[in-house]
Amino acid sequence: LHQLIHSFPTRRSSDLAYDTIQAHFRDTGRRPSDYDLIVTGDLGSLGKEILLDLFHRDGIEFKNLEDCGVLIYDAQTQDVHCGGSGCGCSAAVLTGFLLNGMKQGRWRRLLFCGTGALLSPTSTLQGESIPSICHAVAISTEQ
């Protein structure tokens, strides 16, 4: 389990996802191609594009990156702007779609990277930073 917690007002969840995924690859020696699917939690379409840009800057291209906030809706037929958000979004996509897809043999190796922000109205009104978090869990099925 890789987890990074930051409390900087200028850090986006996409930045933390980048840091966590990089740490996972560095610590395990794995690459994006070692996974059938890499999924972030509720960055939405904008956050996903920011994350892809961060990796592109380092010369790393993903063909297997998805986001729960994008997967949970059909942006072509629903007016959802950037997609879903919140911890329920990631939980629903992981347990209702991704794990079932693994059971059906669609994917064998998954890197799931949940992201979030610990929002507090009091902290925000006091001008304090918004702590953000990202954790990565590698999930695989037996061969």
Model features per residue range: what roles?
Residues 1-3, 26-28, 100, 127:
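Short, flexible, glycine/charge-rich loop motifs used to bind or transfer phosphoryl groups or to couple energy/partner
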Residues 1-13:
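Short, small-residue-biased leader/transition segments that mark boundaries at the very start
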Residues 14-27, 93-98:
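Short, well-ordered amphipathic alpha-helical segments that serve as non-catalytic structural scaffolds
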Residues 36-143:
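Claisen-condensing/thiolase-fold acyl-transfer catalytic domains that form or cleave C-C bonds
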